[in-house]
């Protein structure tokens, strides 16, 4: 299997999906260096769910799938800790990892194909309705939502993966799926 490139990882106790945002406090030297280097290179870094270990201290074992992120915003809190707002962009599969001397995990990755711009299928229309209600309830708290995308299978699936009260393992399962319709079918299967 071919490797598309190398990507430094920031393992977290959350599964980020494409288009979703997460806030992050960065205080460990290895991750401060990662953010600095990422800003200089413009290449971003990857976020993966932690399967074993913690997000501080010894290097954690990351899941085999993750998303590349871009830094949307940053600030330094009153406590002097760097605060980032990250947004997931494209999915990747980790082929192998190595740990640098400073404890930073770097992965050789294979990029997953972008989702097609398929329209929502009739059997998944309920999911778009559910998402519409969730977005309506969230109001301004979910400003990135664009109701015009409620007819696109990929967008509906990723937004539901982001907003529904799923376990991190369920989100990871969705992240591993290449077909947006399969993702929607799985979400439908999890509905009560």
What do the PLM-derived regions correspond to, one by one?
Residues 1-192:
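N-terminal low-complexity, acidic/polar interaction/targeting segments
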């Amino acid at each position: 299997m071919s490797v598309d490139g190398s990507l430094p990882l920031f393992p977290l106790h959350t599964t980020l999906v494409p288009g979703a945002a997460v806030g992050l406090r960065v205080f460990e030297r290895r991750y401060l260096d990662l953010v600095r280097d990422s800003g200089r290179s413009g290449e971003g870094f990857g976020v993966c769910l932690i399967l074993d270990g913690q997000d501080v201290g010894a290097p954690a074992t990351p899941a085999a799938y993750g998303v590349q992120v871009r830094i949307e915003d940053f600030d330094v809190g009153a406590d002097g800790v760097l605060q980032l707002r990250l947004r997931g962009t494209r999915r990747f599969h980790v082929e192998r990892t190595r740990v640098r001397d400073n404890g930073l995990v770097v992965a050789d990755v294979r990029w997953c194909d972008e989702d097609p711009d398929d329209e929502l299928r009739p059997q998944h229309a309920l999911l778009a309705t559910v998402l519409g209600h969730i977005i309506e309830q969230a109001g301004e708290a979910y400003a990135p939502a664009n109701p015009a995308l409620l007819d696109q299978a990929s967008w509906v699936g990723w937004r539901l993966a982001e907003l529904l009260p799923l376990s991190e393992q369920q989100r990871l399962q969705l992240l591993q799926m290449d077909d947006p319709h399969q993702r929607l079918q799985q979400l439908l299967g999890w509905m009560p």
